[in-house]
Amino acid sequence: MNAQLCLDDCFCFDTSALSNMWTSDYRPAALPLVWNVLSAAIEVGAAIAPREVYLELERSRNTEMLKWMKQHRAMFQADTPELVAAVVALERDFPNLVEQDKEPYDADPWVIALAEMAGASVITGEKETGTRVGGMTKPRVKIPDVCRARGIRLASVSDFIEARNAAR
């Protein structure tokens, strides 16, 4: 996988972004057009997420969301040797990114690594902590902190919708 994965504006979604969209900010029953835009973006490879996001959302046991995820399985990218290596390197560079006691996994490094490999913007529900990253083990850093340190673009759901509407 490389930057050629994303031919247009590409967005890599974190678990918190999709969960917040579904349960509060952009509920499908209230804003079905948002989900139509997301579905269309998935079809052309402009909306992606790592498999680990799927696995985290699967634990939510939200049956309607699980049904949607299964219908849009193409969004969730399989692990590749390159992605695994990128995640290992990221966790080495940012040991305070992952909750060490989180079971069974933490999707955060996978989201960042996939976005970096694909040249995608990250959409997350997390807020920047302002913590300086690199070498520190405490306090825990969040996705926006690491993205800032690595020069990976951050975007909001509104940014995504606007970009996808402009791409039509």
Language-model segments: which ranges?
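Short, flexible loop segments at the rims of nucleotide/cofactor-binding pockets, characterized by
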Residues: 23-27, 54-56, 98-103
